[in-house]
Regions:
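Extracytoplasmic small-molecule ligand-binding "clamshell" domains
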Residues: 74-154, 348, 385, 389
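C-terminal motif of bacterial Sec signal peptides marking the signal peptidase cleavage site
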Residues: 20-25
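Bilobed "Venus flytrap"/periplasmic-binding protein-like clamshell domains
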Residues: 91-100, 110-125, 159, 179-241, ...
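Bacterial lipoprotein signal-peptidase II cleavage site
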Residues: 27-37
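Extended ligand-binding regions for polar small-molecule ligands
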Residues: 71-75, 123-125, 187-191, 204, ...
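Short helix-initiation/N-cap motifs at beta->coil->alpha
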Residues: 77, 132-144, 192, 230-245
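Bacterial N-terminal signal peptides that target proteins for export
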Residues: 3-13
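Acidic, polar ligand-binding/catalytic clefts
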Residues: 119, 123, 127, 131-199, ...
Length: 398
């Protein structure tokens, strides 16, 4: 039942499309993967009809200002959850070009960690991980799609920033991938994995337009007193193509995006190196949804938490029945829909998170399916569980 669509949201965006200039990135949000490390600012949601809509304040350079967005689809209950349940399909915004995060495979299927979190939400809400319609969105399009209600949730390696969370008028869910911006160059140009940013002085640097990546590298170059020529492109396929052709000396985006591109696009006659060893920015990536819908926020957030709680407890898709029977403790019994469950208080079925783990997997399983194949190691990273020295620390299911 999984479906993929591209730019259908533009019919809903209408006049907003002209103002959806560029929105920040997954360098934190480029299309590297579209690259994480795969972000922009937009206007607050439109006021009720009787209230005149105000022009939003001008956004920072990396965030385009937009007109107030149309209200999201509502039902009698007035929320996104009810709308999705009535529709029977989750509309999920993704990149469609971000290696390991969301990319369209040769068979037309959407793959990656972001795509799998779309499936996880569909499993929680509808009981079917395949009840998803994917919408591929550029960095400039993504936040307008959230504001207009063209997508129910955005899983597009988008960086959580103050301006996006406040001025643009959206809400961010739990971080699903802690990333950081890095650079990539050719070893033949005397770069190594230990190179510093100062070494790109005089270089032609390429990245996505309208992303946090673009802003970060511009600000850092000014702080370091180095001169770069910054060329930007609409999507990261164009960035990588220009790099392969020799038009760019250096490309930059989220580190995870660079790792993904290197894994699948490095020519045999070239050696690409990623640097500096310590990323130049923080790029927390995760779900984005319309603001002021607490019920929907709870659903999306606890879907993410469920994958992490299962990971904490060592419960995989193969163990859910044993966990529901109590073999992994009382918390997992509650989480999977047994005695003391809390899912029905959220407007979901008691077995909502049973469906998530059984159909999609826990966080480690999602990681192994999408990130391990391109060489991203969770061990020792910020994405490890808190018990292993990482930042993944879900609240308890009780």
């Amino acid at each position: 039942m999984t479906r993929i669509r591209t730019n259908r949201w533009q019919r809903a965006a209408g006049a907003l499309a002209a103002l959806a200039l560029v929105a920040g990135a997954c360098g934190g949000d480029d299309d590297t993967a579209d690259a994480p490390a795969d972000a922009p600012a937009e206007a607050p949601a439109e006021e009720p009809a009787e209230e005149p809509a105000e022009e939003p304040a001008e956004e920072p350079a990396e965030e385009p200002a937009e007109e107030p967005a149309e209200e999201v689809e509502v039902t009698q209950d007035g929320g996104i959850l009810a709308a999705v349940q009535a529709r029977g399909v989750l509309n999920c915004g993704v990149s469609g070009a971000a290696v390991a995060f969301s990319y369209t495979d040769a068979d037309g299927s959407m793959n990656g960690i972001d795509a799998d979190y779309c499936r996880a939400v569909a499993a929680a809400v509808l009981g079917d991980a395949d009840a998803v319609e994917f919408t591929s969105l550029t960095a400039a399009e993504r936040f307008t799609a959230v504001q207009t209600g063209a997508v129910d949730v955005l899983m597009r390696n988008s960086t959580w920033t103050q301006s996006r969370d406040t001025e643009v008028g959206m809400d961010f869910g739990p971080t699903t991938y802690y990333d950081g911006q890095q650079l990539m160059a050719r070893a033949s140009d005397d770069f190594t994995g230990q190179s510093s940013v100062e070494e790109i002085d005089g270089a032609i640097v390429c990245t996505n337009a309208g992303t946090t990546t673009e802003t970060n590298i511009s600000e850092l170059a000014a702080e370091l007193g180095i001169s770069i020529t910054l060329n930007t492109f609409e999507d990261y396929d164009q960035v990588t193509d220009a790099f392969i052709a020799g038009t760019c000396d250096v490309i930059t985006t989220d580190g995870s995006g660079l790792v993904g591109r290197k894994a699948v696009q490095e020519p045999e006659d070239q050696s690409w190196v990623i640097f500096p060893a310590t990323p130049i920015s923080k790029e927390p990536l995760g779900p984005v949804y319309a603001q002021n819908d607490s019920q929907w926020a709870d659903v999306v957030n606890w879907t993410v938490y469920a994958t992490l709680i299962a990971d904490e407890n060592g419960v995989t898709s193969a163990d859910v029945d044993d966990a529901l029977a109590g073999e992994f403790g009382a918390e997992m019994v509650r989480l999977l829909g047994g005695e003391g469950e809390k899912q029905t208080f959220m407007g979901l079925s008691a077995d909502a998170f049973y469906n998530v783990i059984s159909q999609v997997g826990n966080y480690q399983e999602i990681w192994d399916a999408n990130l391990t194949p391109v060489g991203l190691d969770r061990t020792g990273s910020a994405n490890a569980l808190w018990t292993d020295g990482g930042l993944m620390y879900p609240p308890p299911a009780r």
